[in-house]
Regions:
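Exposed, low-structure sequence patches enriched in small/polar residues
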Residues: 1-164
């Protein structure tokens, strides 16, 4: 990172270059079927500490134009000055109206920051390689089973490939 940043209340990661090694094992279940999933575990470097991660994902396609998935990951991070445990859960929905028009949704919870994020993207590929995006984001503080809105953002984006 170019600037120092805080990842725990008392732990700041200094600016600088970091190299990580990571070892991962995983298994995928029926990735082209109506119901699929994945289990994985990994261990490796994380800035100047190390991280264990265990994750699971389940995906369901009730019909070809709708995909629903749930993800969970547990991260245990150890640093010389402390440890952190984070639980991250997410739910996704992908609606394919046509081959050129997609609406994607993501809801994610992070126990370390006690936040819930919502992201909705409407994507229109009006020409091969050229897309318009309408993006809606909200971030909530999740404390004591109550959600408090912290931020709302609406973005319009355009992307295009120019050939010459």
């Amino acid at each position: 990172p170019d600037n120092d940043f805080t990842i725990l209340r008392d732990l700041t990661i200094p600016a600088g270059d970091y190299w990580w090694n990571q070892y991962r094992i995983g298994i995928d279940f029926a990735s082209r079927r109506k119901v699929s999933g994945e289990l994985s575990a990994s261990y490796g470097d994380f800035y100047f500490g190390d991280r264990w991660r265990v994750g699971a994902e389940a995906t369901y396609y009730p019909w070809k134009r709708l995909g629903l998935s749930l993800d969970y990951a547990y991260n245990h991070v150890s640093f010389p000055l402390g440890v952190a445990d984070a639980h991250i859960g997410a739910g996704r929905a992908l609606i394919n109206f046509t081959t050129n028009l997609v609406w994607a949704h993501l809801v994610q919870y992070d126990s370390l920051s006690e936040s819930v994020g919502y992201n909705s993207r409407l994507i229109w590929e009006y020409r091969p390689g050229s897309k318009l995006f309408a993006v809606f984001n909200q971030n909530y503080l999740a404390e004591n089973l109550t959600l408090t809105l912290r931020q709302t953002e609406v973005t319009l984006k355009a992307g295009a490939i120019f050939r010459f």
